[in-house]
């Protein structure tokens, strides 16, 4: 079993850790962006969140939806749906001993696709911008899963 110092010497794992940090920071930013839009537009999903803006019926007017808030929220949900599988499969892939340049290509493509997807979602850019970014990231995760299943796992 590998100890921590061996993991730190594994260049593929360290590349994975670096790109994971970037994509998780981006996802964390989306959470902050959602909260920012909710506060600045005074749009809340829960009654208790409105308490600071009024009481009773006055507070209920803040229980509503807003197109901009919903767009940021959907982009964040899309991150959750795509980054979590990348983290699991990418971790296993990075520990399976892939070629460094191939692994870095996978990681870079995924991170760039997710950043571009967010830009395309929030701007909003016309389709197929967002769809292409989604499918590139999705394809990267599938590629890592295929390589992992083909070469290292017992099926």
Curated annotation (Swiss-Prot):
N6-acetyllysine, modified sites: 42, 55, 60
Superkingdom of the organism of origin: Eukaryota
Keywords linked to the UniProt accession: Acetylation, Endoplasmic reticulum, Membrane, Mitochondrion, Mitochondrion outer membrane, Transferase, Transmembrane, Transmembrane helix
Transmembrane segments: 10-33, 63-96, 100-123, 129-148
GO MF annotation: an example: glutathione transferase activity
Enzyme class: transferase
Cytoplasmic face residues: 34-62, 124-128
InterPro entries in UniProt: MAPEG-like_dom_sf (IPR023352), Membr-assoc_MAPEG (IPR001129), MGST1-like (IPR040162)
Pfam family, one: MAPEG
Reactions that this protein is recorded to catalyse: RX + glutathione = an S-substituted glutathione + a halide anion + H(+)
Location within or outside the cell: Endoplasmic reticulum membrane; Mitochondrion outer membrane
SUPFAM superfamilies with a match to the protein in the record: MAPEG domain-like
Claim: Endoplasmic reticulum is one of the keywords in the record: yes
Lumenal topological intervals: 3-9, 97-99, 149-155
EC code: 2.5.1.18
Positions that bind glutathione: 38, 73-74, 76, 81, 121
Topological relation to the membrane, as annotated: Multi-pass membrane protein
Single GO cellular component term: mitochondrial outer membrane
Signal peptide interval: none
Oligomeric form and interacting partners: Homotrimer; The trimer binds only one molecule of glutathione.
Reported function: Conjugation of reduced glutathione to a wide number of exogenous and endogenous hydrophobic electrophiles.
Family: Belongs to the MAPEG family.
Name used for this protein in its record: Microsomal glutathione S-transferase 1
Gene, per the UniProt record: MGST1
């Amino acid at each position: 079993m590998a100890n921590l110092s061996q993991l730190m010497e594994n260049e593929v794992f360290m590349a994975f850790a670096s790109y994971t940090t970037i994509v998780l920071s981006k996802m964390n930013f989306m959470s902050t962006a959602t909260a920012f839009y909710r506060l600045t537009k005074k749009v809340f999903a829960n009654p208790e969140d409105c308490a600071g803006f009024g009481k009773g019926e006055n507070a209920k007017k803040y229980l509503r939806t807003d197109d901009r808030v919903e767009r940021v929220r959907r982009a964040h949900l899309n991150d959750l749906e795509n980054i979590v599988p990348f983290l699991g499969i990418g971790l296993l892939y990075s520990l399976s001993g892939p070629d460094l340049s191939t692994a870095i290509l996978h990681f870079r493509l995924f991170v760039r696709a997710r950043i571009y997807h967010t830009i395309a979602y929030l701007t909003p850019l016309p389709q197929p911008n967002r769809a292409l970014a989604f499918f590139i990231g999705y394809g990267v995760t599938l590629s890592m899963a295929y390589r992992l299943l083909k070469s290292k796992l017992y099926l």
